[in-house]
UniProtKB/Swiss-Prot annotation:
The keyword Hydrolase applies. It is an enzyme of class 3 (hydrolase). It is found in: Cytoplasm. SUPFAM superfamilies: Urease, gamma-subunit. The lineage of its organism: Bacteria, Pseudomonadati, Pseudomonadota, Gammaproteobacteria, Chromatiales. Pathway: Nitrogen metabolism; urea degradation; CO(2) and NH(3) from urea (urease route): step 1/1. Keywords: Cytoplasm, Hydrolase. Belongs to the urease gamma subunit family. This is Urease subunit gamma. GO terms for molecular function: nickel cation binding; urease activity. GO terms for cellular component: cytoplasm.
Length: 100
């Protein structure tokens, strides 16, 4: 299977997001890379489902709470930017202060 660099990046985000999702479901607190992957993967999936950029910017802030991540992680993540594929093309989605 031949994949472009962009497709490889999306596969890596999806895989890391899946690992983070499983750890979260088991009650483990997510570290920095897991939290970023979890939110990024969720944004990519919702974009494919047709959610707008504005909706995704808000949705990204509802995915994780301080109680679900390790100490200090919320302060480390001020913004997450994901290049997502929408029905009308690719757009950059920025989620500001994603962990409440």
């Amino acid at each position: 299977m031949e994949l472009t660099p962009r497709e490889k990046d999306k596969m890596l985000i999806f895989t890391a997001g899946l690992v983070a999702e499983r750890r979260r479901e088991r009650g483990l607190k997510l570290n920095y890379p897991e939290a970023v992957a979890y939110i990024s993967a969720a944004v990519l999936e919702k974009a494919r489902e047709g959610m707008s950029v504005a909706e995704l910017m808000h949705h990204g802030t509802t995915l994780l709470t301080r109680d679900e991540v390790m100490e200090g992680v919320p302060e480390m993540i001020s913004d997450i930017q994901v290049e997502a594929t929408f029905p009308d093309g690719t757009k950059l989605v920025t989620v500001h202060h994603p962990i409440t």
